[in-house]
């Protein structure tokens, strides 16, 4: 059986790695080739006591208050591949395999945990605490793609806010976390936390010792102890992307901007911009998180596949965010194949309006190339305006309409 298509790359730059006094976050979501990724916004909400929330496969107790979030997600599920909340927290996840067996039973997906961390955490560390507590209570498991063929994995996460970043790596309910306060860091479908463990599951070392994976003597390396003896080919291939991502970050260390992060996500030579027969980059995100709390965070999302052929469009949280139905997939209600048992017995069309327009326009013809050049020029102009706004040189106008206006303009250009 062919190796299942699943890989991702997450990046962060903190001062002095960044050119300005900003934290810069980036992620490519690499998924099955025809999977549609939508961008959805959910406002902050209050919830009645004892209420529950229905995640992709299971329901769990809801909290009293959830943060406003913007999410980029495979259109069939509840959670998200990546996203941000109103407090300037960004989270992205990655598939990983470890010595701990993967749970095929339905539990929380790593993508559910991304959304739950954003909805419930007002800092990167708070989101990490949310995720690890839910892991302990409900575990992780279930099908991670829209198919009846079983495919599950464990997860690693990059959690970022205006001040710091956390790498969280899991093995079943066990986990280790590393705090990053300066410079650049990337993760790619493999364990990376060695001896520098900032926080960990209380039973991490005792379980490792009981399983015979660690002698109990000497330094404890999470990567060495928990990496599988025979990793899937996908994890082995990720090493090339990890090295390529590290090299690109180091090349720009001290001068990382949102534009630099976008160029890294568009890099095909390293495999970071994925495009092959079975899978590709289906959505991308770059965020600017200024250290100054009086400045707004800006989140750029594509809502379309292949960042080298897509436009990053800015989203800023405000009191009145305009809904953007053009990047939201059709709803199928109780008859959705993810909701009917047994699951995934038939396929539905999840393409949203922008996805269709992007698909039609992205040809190899001269007209297609010319259109791409125009769109890239408009993107660079938008970036310059955002940077000027962050420097205080121009006033931000109607921030809640910004993402809508950019999506609307992109569709009109394609037509």
Curated annotation (Swiss-Prot):
Listed InterPro entries: Peptidase_C69 (IPR005322)
Domain of life: Eukaryota
Any GO MF annotation of the entry: dipeptidase activity
Catalytic residues identified in the record: 8
GO BP: proteolysis
Assigned protein family: Belongs to the peptidase C69 family. Secernin subfamily.
PANTHER family, sorted: SECERNIN, SECERNIN-2
Name of the featured protein: Secernin-2
Organism taxonomic ancestry: Eukaryota, Metazoa, Chordata, Craniata, Vertebrata
């Amino acid at each position: 059986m062919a190796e299942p298509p699943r890989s991702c790359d997450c990046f962060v730059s903190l001062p002095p790695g960044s050119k300005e006094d900003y934290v810069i976050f980036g992620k490519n979501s690499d998924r099955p080739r025809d999977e549609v990724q939508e961008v959805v916004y959910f406002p902050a909400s209050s919830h009645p006591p004892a209420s529950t929330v229905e995640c992709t496969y299971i329901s769990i107790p809801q909290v009293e208050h959830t943060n406003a979030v913007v999410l980029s997600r495979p259109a069939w599920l509840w959670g998200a591949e990546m996203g941000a909340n109103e407090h300037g927290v960004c989270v992205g996840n990655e598939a990983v395999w470890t010595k701990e067996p993967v749970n095929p039973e339905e539990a929380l997906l790593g993508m559910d945990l991304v959304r739950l961390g954003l909805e419930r955490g007002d800092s990167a560390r708070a989101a990490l605490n949310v995720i690890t507590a839910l892991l302990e209570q409900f575990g992780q498991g279930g099908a991670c793609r829209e198919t009846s063929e079983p495919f599950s994995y464990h997860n690693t996460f990059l959690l970022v806010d205006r001040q710091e970043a956390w790498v969280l790596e899991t093995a079943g309910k066990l986990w280790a976390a590393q705090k990053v306060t300066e410079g650049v860091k990337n993760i790619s479908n493999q364990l990376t936390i060695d001896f520098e463990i900032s926080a960990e599951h209380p039973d991490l070392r005792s379980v490792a010792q009981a399983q015979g994976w660690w002698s109990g003597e000497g330094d404890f390396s999470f990567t060495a102890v928990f990496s599988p003896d025979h990793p899937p080919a996908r994890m082995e291939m990720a090493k090339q992307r990890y090295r390529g991502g590290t090299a690109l970050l180091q090349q720009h260390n001290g001068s990382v901007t949102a534009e630099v992060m976008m160029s890294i996500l568009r890099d095909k030579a390293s495999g970071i911009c994925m495009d092959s027969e079975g899978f590709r980059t289906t959505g991308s995100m770059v965020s600017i998180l200024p250290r100054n709390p009086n400045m707004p965070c800006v989140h750029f999302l594509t809502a379309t596949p292949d960042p080298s052929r897509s436009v990053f469009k800015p989203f800023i949280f405000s009191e009145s965010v305009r809904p953007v139905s053009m990047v939201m997939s059709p709803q199928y209600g109780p008859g959705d194949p993810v909701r009917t048992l047994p699951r995934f017995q038939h396929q539905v069309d999840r393409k949203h309006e922008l996805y269709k327009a992007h698909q039609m326009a992205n040809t190899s013809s001269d007209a297609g190339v010319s259109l791409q050049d125009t769109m890239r020029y408009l993107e660079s102009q938008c970036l310059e305006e955002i940077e000027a706004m962050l420097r205080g040189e121009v006033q931000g106008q109607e921030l809640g309409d910004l993402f809508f206006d950019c999506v609307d303009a992109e569709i009109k250009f394609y037509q």
